[in-house]
Amino acid sequence: MKKKIIVALILTAVCLTAVLGAAACSNTELVGFDIELANAVGEDLGVSVEFAQINWNTKENELESKNVDLLWNGMTITPEREAMWEISEPYMLNEQVAIIRKADESKFDTKDKMLSSDKWAAESGSAGAELIGDLGATLIGVNAQISVLTELNSGSADIGVMDSVMANYYINESGSTYSSSLMVSPVKIATEEEYYGIAARGGEVALMDKINTSLAKLWADGTISDIAEKYGLSDVVLPIEYTSQWDSITDKSSWDYIAARGKIIIGYTLFAPIAYEVEAA
């Protein structure tokens, strides 16, 4: 019998179109790069995968209280998170980008002009929100990255900051809701690239070694590349190579606990093309 992995999905409270993803909608199917990758890892580890919901703003509490076992949601690897948690090998490249209204392209064609505005929007607690703080700009915090785009369209914000992976999907996809009114600014606001990783509680090395070993196997056999191509992410997915160090850990209790319990809980947010819902066939 397969064991069960529960992947916690942090969903927004509104239903969106199939292009934008959806949450709490009837007759929908959960799809996306991370969703398919999690399913592939589950199959490789001999466990089934189930998706549940948490609040991303309380992800630290959810992880430390053992409501979830992994955070796996296009999560940016940071030194603070590496010090606090066990972090997987990076599996995707990302950067923070500025989103503006097309009508404001000339108004905000330099970083200095952007910084003249006191209306910058980003998801609270995100890498984008942190960057806005680093720039000395005034943050309008929203509860999900997708809400950054609605703030811009409504005029409540002048500049939005979000992951390039998500921005390219929502804005550059032909026919998407925001492609006619918004644009990814060519102005660079971030000095460094970012990397996505998966987090486990600090000390749970054996569990993370299992995840890393599976990811390396799925890279080697082409599974990750196939999933990336499906979601238009071939140019940002990163290779993961196996290292024997992942088999050298003697304390395997964190994985043994999961295996004995028969399920693992992972935190997600609604984040196309990483995780989103479409109408079920």
Predicted regions and their residues:
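Bacterial N-terminal signal peptides that target proteins for export
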Residues: M1-I10
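Sec-dependent signal peptide cleavage junction
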Residues: L16-T28
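Extracytoplasmic small-molecule ligand-binding "clamshell" domains
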Residues: C25-M75, L139, K210, D226, ...
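Bilobed "Venus flytrap"/periplasmic-binding protein-like clamshell domains
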Residues: T28-E43, M75, L93-L149, S164-N168, ...
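Acidic, polar ligand-binding/catalytic clefts
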Residues: I35, N39, E43, S48-M114, ...
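Alpha-to-beta junction loops
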Residues: G46-S48, E64-N73, D118-K119, N153-A167, ...
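Periplasmic-binding protein-like
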Residues: M92-I100, G175-N212, S234-T250
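Ligand-binding clefts/hinges and TM-proximal coupling segments of bilobed small-molecule sensing domains
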Residues: A127-N143, T213-S254
